[in-house]
UniProtKB/Swiss-Prot annotation:
The protein, known as: Small ribosomal subunit protein bS16
Similarity annotation: Belongs to the bacterial ribosomal protein bS16 family.
Cited Pfam families: Ribosomal_S16
Any one Gene Ontology molecular-function term assigned to this protein's record: structural constituent of ribosome
KW Cell membrane (keyword) present: no
HAMAP family tied to this protein: Ribosomal_bS16
PANTHER family with a match to the protein in the record: 30S RIBOSOMAL PROTEIN S16 (PTHR12919), SMALL RIBOSOMAL SUBUNIT PROTEIN BS16M (PTHR12919:SF20)
GO cellular component terms given for this protein: cytoplasm; small ribosomal subunit
InterPro entries, sorted: Ribosomal_bS16 (IPR000307), Ribosomal_bS16_dom_sf (IPR023803)
Higher taxonomy: Bacteria, Pseudomonadati, Chlamydiota, Chlamydiia, Chlamydiales
Length: 119
């Protein structure tokens, strides 16, 4: 069961309000959701309210963000978003380091094999 944090449309015609929800990937846009994580009202003075701790919890559990939800979280909970980006950068750096070490080991083995074949 893959989870996504996305916007769910609410409200009425010409006055749409969005809920930031955690939902299964296969559920419809306005269908069932697992947890309400906040809301966004583009028409009012107070535009949004987000539960930063719950968003961080679900992101650390492996939930994915949609593009629009990521923009809203970056604006409304910058600490959560920056921490998420730092974790992703650290993960990428670790993968790059492992790949670099593997390539070095592989090139050393190839060099040794070439020396042995030359003898």
């Amino acid at each position: 069961m893959a989870l996504k944090i996305r916007l769910r449309q609410q409200g009425r015609r010409n006055h749409v309000v969005y809920r930031l929800v955690l939902a299964d990937v296969e559920s419809p846009r306005d269908g069932r959701y697992i947890e309400l994580l906040g809301w966004y009202d583009p028409h009012s003075a107070v535009n949004y309210q987000l539960k930063g701790d719950r968003i961080f919890h679900w992101l650390s559990q492996g939930a994915e963000l949609t593009e629009k939800a990521a923009v809203l979280i970056k604006q409304g909970a910058p600490g959560v978003y920056s921490e998420l980006m730092a974790k992703q950068a650290a993960r990428k750096a670790a993968v790059c380091q492992k790949r670099r070490a593997y390539r070095q080991r592989r090139s050393l083995k190839r060099a040794e094999a070439a020396k042995a074949a030359a003898k």
